[in-house]
Structure formats: structure tokens, C-alpha cells
């Protein structure tokens, strides 16, 4: 053989390349020794060496390698000396180390020409990502544009805030008291006008048009650089509600109570919606809650007291008056002794201590040993609506003395001991702890009877009674005697919550007391603003 250096990829023998029609490639591959000798014999031929050398030079120089041959006859695929003269095996287009060469090839003719493979037709990929969401269908967009043109017709300079209310309600389908918040969201430069183009850019081009109502409201309420809603975000909303809702017109002469009403509504919203308790309502929390439905209801209902969720003035009145009754020095703060008087001294000292230790919720008021109005709103909602999840979480933290996530027998006994002592002092028939423990276990049906978890409480409709047994004597006794008045109330209005029933009873009581006081004074005189008492 000639002393020719053959690259590794070319030195590898592939039986298919020999193109022997007398023998199949399968036979050649099964006898590698014989095949190698055959290959060596061919490579020793001068003609083969010249052809291989020429191809190597072309390959090194980067020139295209052309291999020609004919497949017209049965002997045309043979190699020099062993095959007819003038034909040569083609070089493998890939190395023998390629995984593809492990696949068995069918014999091919040396003279076959390469087939031209047409490139696939390039089809444009439709856009699948939109920064502001997928744009609305053309039909919906056209309908919206027609309505926009109608409302902005004749207003070349744009609409002012009062004129913008119809746009908010008729085009955006949002509660009318969102008008100010939406207006300011669009009028970033505070010009006092929203032009047609500015509204289209925000509502149509920003794809607000096709978002669901919850997403629209969330984007309008939150600040631009935030991903959550805070209490201050509700201020313009509630200010407009107070200024425009027919059921709240009577408060316009008492701005201090307008402010208290707005605060109370906000606290109630965060109590029920902000489940994380961090003062920041996320989109997920907003979507899971019932605030949007309540807002839509408030916009449609002229009697604000029929909007029981969050916005009822009667509910605000009850909360504020209950706080005012306890705040004897009217500094808008209450201490432990003040709270002990709540519900006609219904609560135990031990539970009040736990409330003021702030294990259930950190007080927003920073005065040591004092509870502010916001803290009281959370307390009264938890106390009077023990069927709700926020209430169960509130009281669970109070009873769970070691904060280990379970309420044990010893922890329940610790709180019940004071209840037992109070019953004895009142000459009431005392119920032993062992008996009441069995009753509580039966009511909850915990997974493990040695302790009660928050999950156990959430799975039972009678969980509120367990807390009443442990620290509210009046409600415990009412439960033991099965107060027929309470049972009748529940049957008459099964859709109402415990809080709804409580607020209704208390409002009637407070109204009657107000009427008696007015009658004793001889006339219903105008409320003295300096007294900071409720107007009625």
C-alpha cells in the first residue's frame, strides 16, 4: 500500500460503500475480517490510490468533492481490479462515529444523483404574547369605539370629571363611584379633562375592554408601581360614594361621620378580604372575596342599608356606637377595663388579656395598653361573627397559648376555669369541664380527639359555639338554654350571617334608646357636632 495518510473519518470502512451487488452489505458486515482484506486490496491499486489522493487534496484545499459514476449495468458498481474500471466508491458524507451510521442502510447505486430537497415553506408564526393581553375581537372593538365616539361627540377638549360618570357606567360597566378613580388614572397630568384619544389609549389599547371586572377594578385601584391595594387606595372611591349615593346624602352635613363611615367600610373590607393580614390586598384575595359583587350592589341599590356586605350604614352605626359606649373618656381609645364591659360583661378576663397581648392581631394604635377604633372593628367582627373564617383564625390564635398550631385539653381547661367560676358566683348550675369537653369534641369532630386544629374548626358549622363556651358566658348560657328567639331568627333568615342578625338587633335597640332620649328632652334637637356622638 502507498504511504498515504487517511483521515480517521475516511479510514473507517463502511461495507455499504463497497457497493458489491454479488454480496449484500449484511453479509459483509457480518464478516469484518474478510471485508477489511477486500478493502485493503482495493486500496493497494494505483488507480484507487490516485483517486483517494486527489480527493484528499481537494478536501484539504476546501474544494468541492465530485464523485461521478454510472449505474446503468450490473457491473457498473464494481471497483478497479475487482470491479469494472472507471468507477470508484463514493466517500461517506459523515464519520463512522455518527450515531446515524449505526442504522442499517439499503444498497444504493454509485451513479445515483443527489435529490434536490425543497426547503419547507416559511409560514409566519402568529403573535402569541401581548404585553397588555390579547387585543379584543374586531367586532367588540368596533362597538366600543362607536359608543366612545357618541359620548365624546362635541367635546373636542375632552370630558370633565362630572361628565365622565356616564362613561364609567355605560362604557366601562363599572360602579359609578369609580368615576373619580378612573378619571385620575387616565388624566395623569391633572389637566381636569380626559380626551377621547386618552380614553381610547387607556381603555381600548390597554385592553381593559376585555378584562373581567375584578381585573379592571384591581388595576384602577392600585398604584401604578404596586401589585396590591392598600387602605388609602379606597379613599377616593368612598369619598365619591358618600357624595353621590342617595342613601348617604344625610351625612353630607356631618363630614366627620362621613370620614368615620369610610374608615369603617375600609376596615371591614380588609378584615374579610385581606386574609394574609398584612394590609395589602392582592389580586388573588380580591378575586376570591365578594367585594366586587358588593360594590355593584351598592351602585344599583338606593337603600344603602340593604347592602349588608361592607357598605351598610346601619352596620357602621352599630360598630361606632358600641365603641363609643366603651370609650368613656372619649379619647378614641379603650383599655382592658373598657373592653371588659362589652356585651354586658360577657367576656372573661383571660380572653381580654389575650386580646391585649395582640397575639391574634397587632394593634394599629401605638399607645401602650390601648385599643384604637380600627382594632375594635376587628374585635367586634370576630366576636359577633364567629362562623366566619377570619373570626375562627382570630380566636384560634387567642386560645392557642403556646402557638404550636393546636388547641389542647389543657388550653381549653385554662379558659373554661374562669367560666366555671363565674357560673358558680351567679348560682348557675355549673357544667363540669369533662362534660363540656365531650360536648365540644362532638361538635367539632376533630381528626385527632387529643387536640383541635384550625382545619378542624373550619370544617364544622358549630365552631363558634366552642369559643362561646370558653370565654363568653352570655352566649354560652344562650346556647345551653337554646334561646328560642335566636333559633327563630336563624330559621326566618337562613341567608343572614351571625353578624347581620346581631347588627340588626343592636340597631333597633340603639334606635329605641335614641327615641327615648329625644322624647325625654322634649324634642329631637339638632345633634351637637362638638360631642362627637352619632347623629342618630
From Swiss-Prot:
Ca(2+) binds at residues 400, 402, 404, 411. GO terms for cellular component: cytoplasm; nucleus. Pfam families: EF-hand_13, EF-hand_7. The keyword Cytoplasm applies. The keyword Metal-binding applies. GO terms for molecular function: calcium ion binding. Probable regulatory subunit of type 2A protein phosphatase. This is Probable serine/threonine protein phosphatase 2A regulatory subunit B''gamma. It comes from Arabidopsis thaliana. The gene is B''GAMMA.
